[in-house]
Amino acid sequence: MRSLILAAALVITSFASGALAEGKRIGVAWGDFQEARWRWDATAMRSMIERNGNKYIPTNAGGSAEQQLRDIEKLVSEGIDALIIQPVDKEAIGPGVDRAAAAGVPILGYDRMIEDERVFYLTFDNVGVGRLIAAIVKQVQPEGNYAIILGDPSDANSTFLRQGMEEIIGAAVAGGQITIVGEANADGWKPENAKAVMEKILADSGNKVDAVLAQNDGMAGAAIEALTSAGLSVPVGGQDGDKAALNRVAQGLQTVSVWKNNFDLAKRAGQIAGLLADGTPMNLIPDAKQFTGGEKGIPVWAILLTPTPVTAENLDVVIDADHVTKQDVCKGAMPSVAACR
């Protein structure tokens, strides 16, 4: 009897070891966790990777392009089967891509484009995000002095977002209905840099700003701080669906936050990385299409998901999706916000 139990235990142990051996090692080179959304993404991504029986191996470069290259070198040397990169700098990441590709490791660029045919690109339609930010702010403020706060100049997303904004406001700028009184990048997408940009625009324009297009919610919040200090309350648009931004929408401080359902994005990344690790060619990833919208026009295989604009009129969308709680979103909300009643 004892020998039977021992034999059974050996079989179970052998099976468990075999199951673990079958799992793939998915390295994730995060650029930073400055924005709350990246921390949410990491949780959802890890959940999907582990649900599929694979191992999640993360690094965090803390906003340093040099550190991210070291992180990728370390991940590749540890024998990962697939690599997800949220690049700090789309150009500086090149040697990291070369290193991973030389080792035969498939690569997924996460929400920030790496314009390289060896890298699968997963993101939202960022040109569409730019359109939504500008369109909703323009509905509220169809003319006047606009300030535009761009993201980091090394991030292709900033270019895509600006392209979308231009599609909405370009004709009004050409026709003189809208005047851009200031436009500048906030290095690293950092709120403190965005606040400095906004303060300079206010100083240069004599506080004559009627609307602000910010390329993410952290920068929108920083712009609102500067506007408030100047005694101004104007339409401000951003994106990411950050909890603080959605609360500002409920309070009437921010006009729109374009929500990119990052849980879906992160889970999809975990799924795709698993497929790539298993040897699935990029062109056979479900829903993949060729994308040539980068600065160099290099064709890459990509999936672009659809974003959702969130205003005071439809805050229930993010609450019902369990993205945020009603309690968090509705603190100090305007009485007119139906989702907060």
Regions found by a protein language model. Give the residues of each.
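A residue-level marker of the well-folded mature domains of exported/periplasmic proteins
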Residues: 20-341
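Positively charged n-region of N-terminal signal peptides that target proteins for export
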Residues: 1-7
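N-terminal signal peptide c-region/cleavage motif recognized by signal peptidases
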Residues: 14-18
